[in-house]
Swiss-Prot record:
EC numbers on record: 4.2.1.96
Family: Belongs to the pterin-4-alpha-carbinolamine dehydratase family.
Superkingdom to which the source organism belongs: Bacteria
Pfam family membership, one: Pterin_4a
Catalytic activity, reaction form: (4aS,6R)-4a-hydroxy-L-erythro-5,6,7,8-tetrahydrobiopterin = (6R)-L-erythro-6,7-dihydrobiopterin + H2O
Gene: phhB
Enzyme class: lyase
Protein name, as recorded: Pterin-4-alpha-carbinolamine dehydratase
Function: Involved in tetrahydrobiopterin biosynthesis. Seems to both prevent the formation of 7-pterins and accelerate the formation of quinonoid-BH2. May also have a positive regulatory role in the expression of phhA.
Keywords: Lyase, Tetrahydrobiopterin biosynthesis
InterPro entries: PCD_sf, Pterin-4-alpha-carb_dehyd, Pterin_deHydtase
GO molecular function, one term: 4-alpha-hydroxytetrahydrobiopterin dehydratase activity
Length: 118
């Protein structure tokens, strides 16, 4: 079991530190299916989840929305027919915080039981 998917987010202020290169190398191993993307000069974590249809993709989007609301940390979500792209980063620090890795792991946990996964 991944310890990250059991962790909770901490409040992240604009002066919170971004993950260091060492932390990044360690944490990314915990979420091997996620990709690091650089957009607008900052790193983001992104993964595409495939589903059998739009209804299942939308249900997964809503489930991710529920954990985001519970933790007070919100992703970018793009819901399409049979596909959901989830992107985590910390807006307040314009980069990656430990919270983002926690939420990737928690998203993976939601995906394990999501109906209609391909």
């Amino acid at each position: 079991m991944n310890a990250l998917n059991q962790a909770h987010c901490e409040a992240c202020r604009a002066d919170a530190p971004k993950v260091t290169d060492e932390e990044l190398a360690e944490l990314i191993r915990e979420i091997p299916d996620w990709n690091i993307e650089v957009r607008d000069g900052h790193m983001e974590l992104e993964r595409v989840f495939l589903f059998k249809n739009f209804k299942h993709a939308l249900a997964f989007t809503n489930a991710v929305g529920e954990i985001a609301e519970a933790e007070g940390h919100h992703p970018g979500l793009l819901t399409e027919w049979g596909k959901v792209t989830v992107t985590w980063w910390s807006h307040s620090i314009k980069g990656l915080h430990r919270n983002d890795f926690i939420m990737c792991a928690r998203t993976d946990k939601v995906a394990e039981t999501a109906e209609g996964r391909k």
